Amino acid sequence: MIRAYEQNPQHFIEDLEKVRVEQLTGHGSSVLEELVQLVKDKNIDISIKYDPRKDSEVFANRVITDDIELLKKILAYFLPEDAILKGGHYDNQLQNGIKRVKEFLESSPNTQWELRAFMAVMHFSLTADRIDDDILKVIVDSMNHHGDARSKLREELAELTAELKIYSVIQAEINKHLSSSGTINIHDKSINLMDKNLYGYTDEEIFKASAEYKILEKMPQTTIQVDGSEKKIVSIKDFLGSENKRTGALGNLKNSYSYNKDNNELSHFATTCSDKSRPLNDLVSQKTTQLSDITSRFNSAIEALNRFIQKYDSVMQRLLDDTR
C-alpha cells in the first residue's frame, strides 16, 4: 500500500521506491513516456520539502526529478489506465484530461514544484467538469495571453532600440565634426556602420546575432577602396537613404556636409537627423511603458496561480486532517 502524498510526501516517495512501475495504475498508459519526456524537456523540478505546519516528521528536502525512474513512478501513480473502448465517454474524458495536463506543463512558466502542489495540479487537469479546473484554465489562459504579448513587445522594442542606437552613432559622428567645425563625408569616406565596435560589441558572432546587425544587413552598401582593394561598407548615407527601417528614407542627401558660420549645412544636417529619430525615441518610451505594464500583468497571473495552488493545498490539508 502506498501512503498518501498529501499526508507525508516522504512516506509516499519511500513507498513508491519499493514498488515496480508495472505495479502502478498508469504503467501501461500510452502517454506515460511522453509526459516523462515533457517534464525533462521543460526542466521541471519536483521536490519534497519539509513543512513544519503540515509534516509531523522531519525529513530532508529532495529533488525527486533527478531520478528518472522515480519520476516515471510518480506520473504512473496518478495516470489512469487507457480506456478499453476507444471513442467512448470515458475515453473522451480521459483524453481531454491528458490534453489539459500537457497544455499545463507546456504553458506554465513555473518550473519549481513542491510535490503536493504538482500532484494537485495534475489531478485538477485529469478530472473534468470541476470549478477548480475552470479557474486554472482562466489563469493559464491569462498567462499565455500576456506571455505572448510580452514576447512580441520585447522583439519590437529590441528592433526599435537598435535603430535608435544606430541613429545615436550617426549623431555622435556628426557632433564630432561640428565641434571641430569640419566636414563630414557620409558616403565613400563614411564610418562603416557595420563596425561592431560602434555599438559596444567585441565578438563578431554576438554582433551578427544582434538587433543592430539585423537592421544593417538590410541596408544597401557602398564600395570603397582600402589599400588598393575593394571593400563594402554600410555608410551613413546608405542607412539614412534606405526605406528598410522603421523611420523610412531621408531624401535629398548629399555626399558631404561642411561647417559654415553663415550657412551651416552641417548643423542643419544634424537637426534633420535628430528630427528624423525623435518619433522613434517617443515610440521606444511608449513601448517600454507597455512592456512594463504587460510584464506586471503576466507576473500577477503567475502570483494568482501560486496563490490558488497554495489555497487549494491548504483546504485539502484541512480536509485530510479532519479525516484522521
Curated annotation (Swiss-Prot):
Keyword Secreted in the entry? The reply is yes
Q: Does the keyword NADP apply?
A: no
Subcellular location per UniProt equals: Secreted
Instruction: Write the record's keywords in alphabetical order, separated by commas.
Output: Plasmid, Secreted, Virulence
Please provide an example of a Pfam family that matches this protein in its UniProt record: LcrV
Q: What is its main location?
A: secreted
Gene Ontology cellular-component annotations: extracellular region
Q: Which InterPro entries does the UniProt record give?
A: LowCa_resp_V_Ag, Vir_assoc_V_ag_sf
What is the recorded function of this protein according to its Swiss-Prot or TrEMBL entry? Possibly involved in calcium regulation of YOP expression, which includes the export process.
Protein name as it appears in the record: Virulence-associated V antigen
